[in-house]
Design a protein with these regions (language model features):
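C-terminal output helix
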Residues: 105-114
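Conserved phosphotransfer cores of two-component systems
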Residues: 41-42, 67-75
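Conserved phosphotransfer microenvironments
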Residues: 48-69
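Conserved acidic carboxylate
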Residues: 9, 82
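The C-terminal output helix
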Residues: 115-120
């Protein structure tokens, strides 16, 4: 079953890699460099986001970013993919996300996390 995924990633190389992995797995991927790019599709099942809106990686700013993502895609699960996890975050729940993957991430872990959140 094709699932709609929005990928918010400002690094074009990482965006291309993740897009290829998800597309190869049969998903429809909308790649954006910011939350504002593109239209809001309420049928989106999953959002994978870097903490692209942040200049630093403090906990309050990260939580605010995830809240903006959730407001834009209220029905979607959210994965944070980041090279710099904010200090004080013990896991996804600390950010308000469903999962946090630290870059560079293991492809198998990434795939299992995506499929788990999509209910596949």
């Amino acid at each position: 079953m094709t699932r709609r995924i929005v990928l918010i990633e400002d690094d074009p190389d990482i965006a291309r890699l993740v897009d290829d992995m998800l597309t190869d797995a049969g998903h429809e991927v909308d790649v954006r460099s910011t939350l504002a790019d593109g239209t809001i599709d309420r049928d989106t099942q999953l959002v994978i986001t870097d903490l692209v809106a942040l200049r630093g990686y403090d906990l309050q700013a990260a939580r605010a970013w995830i809240a903006r993502v959730r407001a834009a895609f209220p029905e979607a699960a959210v994965i944070v993919s980041t090279a710099h996890q904010p200090a004080g975050v013990a896991g996804a729940s600390g950010l308000g996300a469903d999962a946090v993957l630290t870059k560079p991430f293991d492809v198998d872990v990434f795939t299992r996390t995506v499929e788990s959140l999509l209910g596949a």
